[in-house]
């Protein structure tokens, strides 16, 4: 009986993927690719792009921030989806 209970607990943890955290890219513009592990409960990555007098700029990270008009924002929910 204890073995059955333990098996059910392990199966539940595996199936629910408890504790999984999202991994997002977090480099800016043309910097080398880096990643960050998002805080628990944060399951979204973002990629925002805007134009400046120096050209197009890109910022990436965890979450899905509100942006001002003129900034293109793309949010997604898989690891490293914010290319």
Curated annotation (Swiss-Prot):
Tagged with keyword Ligase: no
Name used for this protein in its record: Neurotoxin 3FTx-RI
Tissue-specificity statement: Expressed by the venom gland.
Similarity section: Belongs to the three-finger toxin family. Short-chain subfamily. Type I alpha-neurotoxin sub-subfamily.
GO cellular component labels: extracellular region
Native organism: Bungarus fasciatus (Banded krait)
Subcellular location: Secreted
Chief location bin: secreted
């Amino acid at each position: 009986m204890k073995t059955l209970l333990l098996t059910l607990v392990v199966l539940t943890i595996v199936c629910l993927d408890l504790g999984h955290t999202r991994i997002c890219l977090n480099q800016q513009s043309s910097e080398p690719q880096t990643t960050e592990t998002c805080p628990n409960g944060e399951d979204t990555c973002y990629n925002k792009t805007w134009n400046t007098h120096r050209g197009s700029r890109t910022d990436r990270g965890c979450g899905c921030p509100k942006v001002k008009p003129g900034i293109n924002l793309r949010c997604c929910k898989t690891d490293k989806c914010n290319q």
